[in-house]
């Protein structure tokens, strides 16, 4: 970021996307003083291009991606303990972000959701609506 960082923004992209799709947003956030963290989900981005398999993180894709995003937080959290942590999720990424918000130990001081989608079949057990409502209150 330019100057002293003010917060961390973790970007979680949607299904079939990749983190580079958000370069314009990443650039604006960096210019505004934010630390930006963005990765590609399993089966997305460069990995998918090289393997030819798109948007496939396996049979338990949601849990795989949630686990990956939480691992990313854990790996980087020590570097940014003094900064607020905002999770931004777009489309399927908004579902991942909402699920993360219900998990104990998730680093979350702010939640920004874009292109919010409904909860599809199979995602019911991932979200705890009472905990999510409490986290967002």
Regions found by a protein language model. Give the residues of each.
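Short beta-strand-to-loop junctions in surface cap/lid or active-site-entrance loops
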Residues: 1-5
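Alpha/beta-hydrolase
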Residues: 12, 39-41, 114
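Short N-terminal helix/helix-N-cap motif within the alpha/beta-hydrolase-1
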Residues: 19-23, 46-49
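Alpha/beta-hydrolase-fold enzymes
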Residues: 96-137
């Amino acid at each position: 970021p330019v100057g002293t960082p003010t917060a961390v923004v973790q970007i979680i992209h949607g299904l079939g996307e990749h983190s580079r799709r958000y370069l314009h947003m990443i650039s604006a956030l960096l210019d505004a003083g934010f630390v930006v963290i963005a990765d590609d989900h399993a089966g997305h981005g460069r990995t998918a291009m090289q393997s030819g398999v798109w948007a496939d993180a396996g049979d338990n894709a949601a849990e795989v991606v949630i686990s990956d995003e939480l691992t990313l937080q854990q790996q980087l959290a020590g570097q940014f303990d003094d900064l607020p942590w905002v999770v931004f999720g777009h489309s399927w990424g908004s579902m991942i972000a909402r699920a993360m918000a219900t998990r104990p130990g998730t680093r979350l001081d702010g939640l920004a959701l874009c292109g919010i989608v409904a909860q599809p079949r199979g995602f019911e057990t991932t979200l705890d609506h009472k905990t999510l409502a409490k986290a967002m209150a």
